[in-house]
């Protein structure tokens, strides 16, 4: 994992900036984007034409993913969707790749798991929802193992995996943030894994800067709202974000879109110093030792990676709740009750 401010982090930051415009670097990379797009199109066509067959795992599958690289708010969306499906009478389970973990075979994730063995996002989902969560690079194998261990599960939510065509799915939800499709180019010239025109059942847009939605069919606003911060060492100790307004605060985030976390805090009335860490940052040591601040605000995704050895009394965790449009929930429930995996 690259260090904060290291060469890899700087390269990632530059690409992220370049992907928002059609500058010289983006145009120079378009030949590689054409090759990437051709390979991706061949994979899609192989399944669309029946040359390869997706695997039906026996229950409906909802894939929550994106067509861009980087964080868009998928994890809080998965958590909210699991809660909504449970409220609608389903018994959901979750599968994920387990990015950042050394996982080769289907592995169960429990609230007591370690992030290094499960992945930070699956561990957060397990802790927040209490639903069965299994991880494996092969999501079909993860889903089959989950069903064998939990035969009462009647719907599976796939955290990411939109491009994992081998897993048959009933519903596809694509999540965007305010960057939408960036410059509209495929990787590596732009942020797109697939064209924006890719079919999906619904689109969710998480944009803290604007309430306007793009003119796409079946598009819904995704609102991410911060809750009261809880103390890392004493989780029952909570403070409204407004109480940090007159303190020296550092906001740090090792997520795909750290600026979105910082914007959330600013919208809550804070003016923190900020530090963007690499996505899935491992926290092998404390990067905040030399920071002269009263409080350090971090994300839940980062908090699950901090074990008992962390004793920095300044650390506070800011939970985020996703509010799903009731019309979106109704659409998903209708499709689950009316269709088989395909």
From Swiss-Prot:
Pfam families per record: LpxK
Residue pairs linked by disulfide bridges in the UniProt entry: none
InterPro entries linked to this entry: LpxK (IPR003758), P-loop_NTPase (IPR027417)
A single GO molecular function term of this UniProt record: tetraacyldisaccharide 4'-kinase activity
Residues holding ATP: 68-75
Gene Ontology cellular component annotations, sorted alphabetically: plasma membrane
EC number: 2.7.1.130
Catalytic reaction annotation: a lipid A disaccharide + ATP = a lipid IVA + ADP + H(+)
Pathway(s) the chain acts in: Glycolipid biosynthesis; lipid IV(A) biosynthesis; lipid IV(A) from (3R)-3-hydroxytetradecanoyl-[acyl-carrier-protein] and UDP-N-acetyl-alpha-D-glucosamine: step 6/6
Family affiliation: Belongs to the LpxK family.
PANTHER family listed in its UniProt record: TETRAACYLDISACCHARIDE 4'-KINASE, TETRAACYLDISACCHARIDE 4'-KINASE, MITOCHONDRIAL-RELATED
Its biological purpose: Transfers the gamma-phosphate of ATP to the 4'-position of a tetraacyldisaccharide 1-phosphate intermediate (termed DS-1-P) to form tetraacyldisaccharide 1,4'-bis-phosphate (lipid IVA).
Protein name: Tetraacyldisaccharide 4'-kinase
Protein's organism: Burkholderia cenocepacia (strain ATCC BAA-245 / DSM 16553 / LMG 16656 / NCTC 13227 / J2315 / CF5610) (Burkholderia cepacia (strain J2315))
Gene: lpxK
